[in-house]
Amino acid sequence: MNKIAKTVLMTGTALCAAGVVLSTAGYFAGGKDFTYTSDHMYVSGGNSSSHKNLAVMKKEQIDDFTKLNVDFQDFDLDIRTSDDDHYYMEYKLEKNGTKNPLTWKDKDGELTLEESAGGSGSYYITYDLGIFSKHVDLTQKKDALNTVILYIPEKAQLSEAELQLSDGDLAADQLLCKEMTLELLNGDLMLDKGEFEKFDAKFSDGDLNVKELQCTDNMQLKSGNGDVTIKKAELADGQIALSDGDLQMGNSSFNGDMKINSSCGDVSVEMKNGSAEKTNIYLKAADGDVDTEGLSRGKTDNEEDTSVYENKAGASAPTLNVKCSDGDITLTESEK
């Protein structure tokens, strides 16, 4: 073994040994006091006594409500399906000082949740846990720190909901609401099923991931810096605007006039089988390509950096209008 290789080996061994020593010291100094939250590990900055500085509400039944107001600075919101016909709430929140970090009021069918000045900010470190990811998922469902968890009956529909989260995520099994107003400044939305009449959502810096979305009246969606993924959609009138991010929509149908504008990002729309020819479609990519391979009708025109596709189905037919300033447009139909 030459001198350089021997030096490298000895240095690596020394660093590994130092890492073991430091990890062990950190563990016994309070590093073991951590918990999992959505998509990341939460690492508490305190020692073992930090558990004493928590505001805890074990799962407890609350009054029924049809209106929901939420205003959080750092907390996450998790809406789950109740196992029965009752409403419940639980949380485990860090606090600064003695003040409860959450103020809430449930009166006359209206639930209001507001993060107070007593809340504590969070510090996150993300790890790829590989084979341990399943364990993390189970743990985070069981014990979520700095997350308010609401349980709503499966068939319950809210009349109004206004949710504002500055630096937190929103996760929901389902949201059934006539009028939904949502604003996330720096967080993600993970929604399995959403049914709305009116849906107004704004995202400054975060991703939107929805498995199933239905909006029967009007939808307004603005995304600043993040990707939007909707696996299945049934939409009426509305507009989707993206500043910097990709849009992916699968198995979608449009029953009104829908406009999609993307400043910087690709747009991919999969329409429900057989619906494209019955829809007025106008696609324009100013600095990109338009791909409509597989569609039997419509006209494509390419000039320099601009690509256009158009299909005319009649004045009474629904309309899909997609424009990309810097990105590609892909339009397909589902197999079934």
Region annotations inferred by a language model:
Residues 1-7:
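Positively charged n-region of N-terminal signal peptides that target proteins for export
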Residues 9-26:
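Hydrophobic membrane-insertion alpha-helices, especially the h-region
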Residues 26-116, 122-123, 143-164, 169-183, ...:
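Short linear S-[DN]-x-LW-Φ motif typified by the pepsin-like aspartic protease active-site region
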Residues 39-43, 50-51, 60-63, 83-86, ...:
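N-terminal start-of-chain detector that recognizes signal peptides
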Residues 90-91, 122-130, 202, 260, ...:
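A short, polar/proline- and glycine-enriched secondary-structure boundary/capping micro-motif
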Residues 122-141, 294-312:
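Acidic/polar low-complexity surface segments
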Residues 168, 187, 206, 226:
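Conserved Rossmann-like nucleotide-cofactor binding loop
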Residues 192-193, 199, 208-223, 227-336:
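Short, surface-exposed interaction patches in beta-rich subdomains
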